Amino acid sequence: MSASASTAADFVRFALDEGVLRFGSFKVKSGRISPYFFNAGLFNSGRSVGALAGFYAQALVDSGVAFDMLFGPAYKGIPLATATSVALAGHAAMAGRDVPFAFNRKEAKDHGEGGTLVGAPLTGKVVIIDDVITAGTSVRESVEIIRAAGAEPAAVLIALDRMERAGPDDALSPHSAVQDVARTYGIPVVSIASLADIMTLLQDDAQFAEHRAAVQAYRSKYGV
């Protein structure tokens, strides 16, 4: 499930402008050589994170998913949940709703408030927010935390769906990591944009035409 076409297109342009999305030849975590690379860690200033949060908020509103709060898994999800909560508070479609958020620590504190959870109590329908889904480990841990607190995972919200099958080349999964998460936990995965939106840019903008064939070949081999 992706955001609206206009939101997705604007986000792809934004990611390119920020140097977060690049074309070339990159060895990614899976060991594959990818013709594009998306590094959300390069959203690292107040301006860029503020704009990113606006895209997350719009994608969540576009999705129509019913939710009560946000959860950001440590560590990357922490600033994403925080900033997106702020963006939602100012979103016209939210009608003044003040969306709470929480996140976890990797290690429990034994002083102060203690425990592994920080922020609002986990209650109601909770949206997990992260940058991408690679192996689904972060989502699994988040679902366990949310359910243990008596709350309900409502959706996973990510920046980019790579639409890519997992596994070695001689034993590729028929599903992507995003599809596996949706099937395993019975919840939608909402992305601001996807590889399909990147391909649309490559097809429509002559500036990036030189990368079109490589990305299409990669998608044909590994895509879903």
Curated annotation (Swiss-Prot):
Record key words, sorted: Glycosyltransferase, Magnesium, Pyrimidine biosynthesis, Transferase
A single GO BP: pyrimidine ribonucleoside biosynthetic process
Cofactor(s) required for function per UniProt: Mg(2+)
UniProt EC number: 2.4.2.10
MF-aspect GO terms: magnesium ion binding; orotate phosphoribosyltransferase activity
Residues the entry annotates as binding 5-phospho-alpha-D-ribose 1-diphosphate: 29, 75-76, 105-106, 109, 111, 130-138
Gene Ontology cellular-component annotations: cytoplasm
Residues binding orotate, per UniProt: F37, F38, T134, R162
Reaction it catalyzes: orotidine 5'-phosphate + diphosphate = orotate + 5-phospho-alpha-D-ribose 1-diphosphate
Gene3D superfamilies: 3.40.50.2020
Keyword Magnesium appears in the UniProt entry: yes
Pathway linked to the protein: Pyrimidine metabolism; UMP biosynthesis via de novo pathway; UMP from orotate: step 1/2
Enzyme class: transferase
Role, per record: Catalyzes the transfer of a ribosyl phosphate group from 5-phosphoribose 1-diphosphate to orotate, leading to the formation of orotidine monophosphate (OMP).
Name of this protein: Orotate phosphoribosyltransferase
